[in-house]
């Protein structure tokens, strides 16, 4: 109905805005984003609905649809044999949450963008990711983020829409760069069990891929020098 449509449109606009905030949208995309914002304000005024409240309701609707779709995909996977599986370490809220860097560092690694906050020091950090898997190997990275124990986002690896396509080795190398940069500031970094299983294939006892000190220093300098 009209209200539900407005709620979903509000949430999808929020997701597109997050994409634009990462400076990944082209000019037509940004133009549509601005025009759609004006349209949503007008529709909200006509319907007497608050956009922020509508966005939260739209998020719940989208989450329900995705859960139903995942169940259907799982049934089809069982019926048809080998197929991609979508694995989630992060919730939709963790994926769409805004975050800011006090000392931003950024590196392009092929079709992947690595971002991190160099101001973070002496923290326990865990890497979480949402990605697809086929034949028990990482197929496509959707998004990877680094979280402190209190849930703050301090790093991220995301694919570039303008440069589609990456391998599991590309993702592994990007994760190594991110870990090296974070550990340069005496942070302790570990990866989620899902990432250990499908992206790294090996780890030490604390769930962190083994990285020699020399390699860590080299990767940290690389991130700093390429920004």
UniProtKB/Swiss-Prot annotation:
A motif (Nuclear localization signal) lies at residues 31-35. GO terms for biological process: symbiont-mediated suppression of host cytoplasmic pattern recognition receptor signaling pathway via inhibition of RIG-I activity; symbiont-mediated suppression of host gene expression; symbiont-mediated suppression of host mRNA processing; symbiont-mediated suppression of host PKR/eIFalpha signaling; symbiont-mediated suppression of host type I interferon-mediated signaling pathway. Transmembrane segments: none annotated. Residues 202-227 are annotated as: Disordered. Homodimer. Interacts with host TRIM25 (via coiled coil); this interaction specifically inhibits TRIM25 multimerization and TRIM25-mediated RIGI CARD ubiquitination. Interacts with human EIF2AK2/PKR, CPSF4, IVNS1ABP and PABPN1. The lineage of its organism: Viruses, Riboviria, Orthornavirae, Negarnaviricota, Polyploviricotina. Pfam families: Flu_NS1. It comes from the Viruses. This is Non-structural protein 1. Residues 220-227 are annotated as: PABPN1-binding. InterPro entries: NS1, NS1A, NS1A_effect_dom-like_sf, uS15_NS1_RNA-bd_sf. The keyword Metal-binding does not apply. Residues 177-212 are annotated as: CPSF4-binding. It is found in: Host nucleus; Host cytoplasm. Upon interferon induction, ISGylated via host HERC5; this results in the impairment of NS1 interaction with RNA targets due to its inability to form homodimers and to interact with host EIF2AK2/PKR. It comes from Influenza A virus (strain A/Duck/Ukraine/1/1963 H3N8). Inhibits post-transcriptional processing of cellular pre-mRNA, by binding and inhibiting two cellular proteins that are required for the 3'-end processing of cellular pre-mRNAs: the 30 kDa cleavage and polyadenylation specificity factor/CPSF4 and the poly(A)-binding protein 2/PABPN1. In turn, unprocessed 3' end pre-mRNAs accumulate in the host nucleus and are no longer exported to the cytoplasm. Cellular protein synthesis is thereby shut off very early after virus infection. HAMAP family: INFV_NS1 (MF_04066). The gene is NS. Keywords: Eukaryotic host gene expression shutoff by virus, Host cytoplasm, Host gene expression shutoff by virus, Host mRNA suppression by virus, Host nucleus, Host-virus interaction, Inhibition of host innate immune response by virus, Inhibition of host interferon signaling pathway by virus, Inhibition of host PKR by virus, Inhibition of host pre-mRNA processing by virus, Inhibition of host RIG-I by virus, Inhibition of host RLR pathway by virus, Interferon antiviral system evasion, RNA-binding, Ubl conjugation, Viral immunoevasion.
């Amino acid at each position: 109905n009209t209200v539900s449509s407005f709620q979903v449109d509000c949430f999808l606009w929020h997701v597109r805005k997050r994409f634009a905030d990462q400076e990944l949208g082209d000019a037509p995309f940004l133009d549509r984003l601005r025009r759609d914002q004006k349209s949503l304000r007008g529709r909200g005024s006509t319907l007497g609905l608050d956009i922020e409240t509508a966005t939260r309701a739209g998020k719940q609707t989208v989450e329900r649809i995705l859960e139903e779709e995942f169940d259907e995909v799982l049934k089809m996977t069982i019926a048809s044999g080998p197929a991609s599986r979508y694995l989630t370490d992060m919730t939709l809220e963790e994926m769409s949450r805004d975050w800011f860097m006090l000392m931003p560092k950024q590196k392009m690694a092929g079709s992947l963008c690595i971002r991190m906050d160099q101001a973070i020091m002496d923290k326990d950090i865990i890497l979480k990711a949402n990605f697809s898997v086929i034949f028990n190997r990482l197929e496509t990275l959707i998004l990877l983020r680094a979280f402190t124990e209190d849930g703050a986002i301090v790093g991220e690896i995301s694919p570039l829409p303008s440069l589609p396509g990456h391998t599991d080795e590309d993702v592994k190398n990007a994760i190594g760069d991110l870990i090296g940069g974070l550990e340069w500031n005496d942070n302790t970094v570990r990866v989620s069990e899902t990432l250990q299983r499908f992206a790294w294939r090996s780890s030490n006892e604390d769930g962190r891929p083994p990285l020699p000190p020399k390699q860590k220093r080299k990767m940290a300098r690389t991130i700093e020098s390429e920004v």
